[in-house]
Swiss-Prot record:
Sequence similarity: Belongs to the RavA family.
NCBIfam families in UniProt: PRK13531.1
Name by which UniProt lists this protein: Regulatory ATPase RavA
Role according to the record: Component of the RavA-ViaA chaperone complex, which may act on the membrane to optimize the function of some of the respiratory chains. RavA functions as an ATPase.
Reaction(s) this enzyme catalyzes, per UniProt: ATP + H2O = ADP + phosphate + H(+)
One GO CC annotation: cytoplasm
Gene: ravA
Lineage of origin: Bacteria, Pseudomonadati, Pseudomonadota, Gammaproteobacteria, Enterobacterales
Pfam families for this protein: AAA_lid_8, ATPase_RavA_C, bpMoxR, LARA_dom
Listed GO MF terms: ATP binding; ATP hydrolysis activity
Length: 498
């Protein structure tokens, strides 16, 4: 086998060649290529005239000497038009019921069937066998068919509870296409002189029959790690809980896993990675409503769980809570404690400063910063005499915020532990302490836990950076995952600075 990274590079170059001259169809081409390389089927949904047939025609050039068959279904289509006419000679001379399949679906590697839902039962039943078993019954004989890719297309979905659902379930990849949207792309499409039927793929990039057969075996050897299976099972359970979620058969899950294995294989990896699960957004939907729902659920999975984002945030929350507990314990030890005086029969409890507090101006530190008078305050300066009078008689108390400017009126109180507490307009409080009595920096326990968490974050981010080199995943999804990881990292760093 070629070096995995060389294979990934080759498939990327092959896809780029197939995409030439097709505007805003890169994702569709890449997924159709992935389907062709893994022997799966694709359904293209969209209005007429948006290059659905051209996509299928292009895929023929991915393979050396591949044969293509395409057909536009109508209500009057017959099996002869798809699978080949009956051999009059065989019927006349030998009494054999046999079709002449040369040039028809049974001998084609790439098949495109437009307006698929207009096919009649006779065509559908034979087509189901062809998709499921890659076999075609020709008279008394069962023949293997070489079909590598079936692309079915329509401008509508099959009716619910119709005989078409069995065929629809066989279409593993489902893509919703629309007209060219970008102005520059639209102009390029209008002015392009490229012959759409020319082969854009160099012979050196085309897949040989031997390579294709070997790859089918090697795709099956790609492993499904436990943590990736857990993500898949989490998604399945979540979908089962949602009343509007589409029904996903066990067969579809099974086929989807092989597609994920193929994605990993052609990305140069030996195991399925969480990033491959994004492909499920194009496999599990049924209609427009379920398309949005599936994308939402996979987005939650990718940005919240696939790289342990939510788990790391939960750990961070526990660490922050523990830090707050330690801060509270430290506050109780280091806070300025005033002395309660007699005054049993007085209306107001009286206090005085400790005897060791003798400075004429006291600078007291806030155990946690507060916003007071539109200023972020970390310490307050009091005149000792003013503070003593307030402790004894109550009334108004003023202090200089951060030791600057005029003294400002403060909401100060003595709590049940005889500590001075200043409150902001929302009544959030901060205990006051003498300089030098407040703990400096993070406690060792908290610092170690945050360092371990940051180390785990770096590992997850490195894993994502390595896995995101995947041709088949759209860049906007990778961007959202990167943003979710960066958000977790920023919160960890912020906690380390507290």
């Amino acid at each position: 086998m070629a070096h995995p990274h060389l294979l990934a590079e080759r498939i990327s170059r092959l896809s780029s060649s197939l995409e030439k001259g097709l505007y805003e169809r890169s994702h569709a081409i890449r997924l159709c290529l992935l389907a062709a390389l893994s022997g799966e089927s694709v359904f293209l949904l969209g209005p007429p005239g948006i290059a659905k047939s051209l996509i299928a025609r292009r895929l023929k050039f991915a393979f050396q000497n591949a044969r293509a068959f395409e057909y536009l279904m109508t209500r009057f289509s017959t099996p002869e038009e798809v699978f080949g006419p009956l051999s009059i000679q065989a019927l006349k001379d030998e009494g054999r019921y046999e079709r002449l399949t040369s040039g028809y679906l049974p001998e084609a590697e790439i098949v495109f069937l437009d307006e698929i839902w207009k096919a009649g039962p006779a065509i559908l039943n034979t087509l189901l066998t062809a998709i499921n078993e890659r076999q075609f019954r020709n008279g008394a004989h069962v023949e293997k068919i070489p079909m590598r890719l079936l692309v079915a297309a329509s401008n509508e979905l099959p009716e619910a509870d119709s005989s078409l659902e069995a065929l629809y379930d066989r279409m593993l990849i489902r893509l919703w296409l629309d007209k060219v949207q970008d102005k520059a792309n639209f102009r390029s499409m209008l002015t392009s002189q490229q012959d759409e039927n020319d082969n854009p793929v160099p012979a050196s990039l085309q897949v040989t029959d031997e390579e294709y057969e070997r790859w089918q075996k090697e795709i099956g050897e790609i492993t499904l790690p436990d943590h990736v299976f857990e993500l898949i099972f989490m998604l399945r359970q979540q979908l089962d809980k949602l009343p509007d979620a589409p029904y996903v058969s066990d067969r579809r899950w099974k086929k989807a896993i092989r597609l994920l294995q193929a994605s990993a294989f052609f990305s140069g990896r030996s195991a399925v990675a969480p990033v491959d699960l994004i492909l499920l957004k194009d496999c599990l939907w049924y209609d427009a409503q379920s398309l949005n729902l599936i994308q939402q659920q996979i987005d939650v999975l990718m940005t919240g769980h696939a790289w342990q984002q939510q788990g790391m945030l939960t750990r961070l929350g526990a660490i922050v809570q523990r830090h707050l507990q330690l801060q509270q314990q430290q506050s109780d030890k280091t806070a300025l404690t005033v002395i309660r005086l007699g005054g049993i029969f007085s209306r107001r409890q009286q206090y005085q400063l400790p005897v060791n507090v003798t400075a004429s101006t006291l600078t007291l530190l806030l155990q946690k910063p507060l916003k007071l008078h539109d200023m972020e305050v970390v310490h307050i300066s009091f005149e000792r005499s003013a503070l003593e009078q307030w402790l004894s008689k109550g009334g108004e108390i003023r202090g200089k915020l951060n030791g600057i400017g005029f003294a400002q009126k403060l909401n100060l109180e003595v709590d049940s532990a005889q500590h001075l507490v200043v409150r902001d307009v929302s009544l959030q409080g901060s205990t006051l302490a003498l300089p030098g009595s407040s703990a400096e920096g993070l406690p060792g326990e908290i610092k170690q836990q945050l360092e371990e968490l940051e180390s785990d974050w770096r590992k997850q981010h490195a894993l994502f950076s390595e896995q995101q080199k995947c041709l088949f995943i759209p860049g906007d999804w990778l961007g959202r995952i990167e943003a979710s990881l960066q958000d977790v990292g920023a919160q960890i760093r912020q906690a380390q600075q507290c």
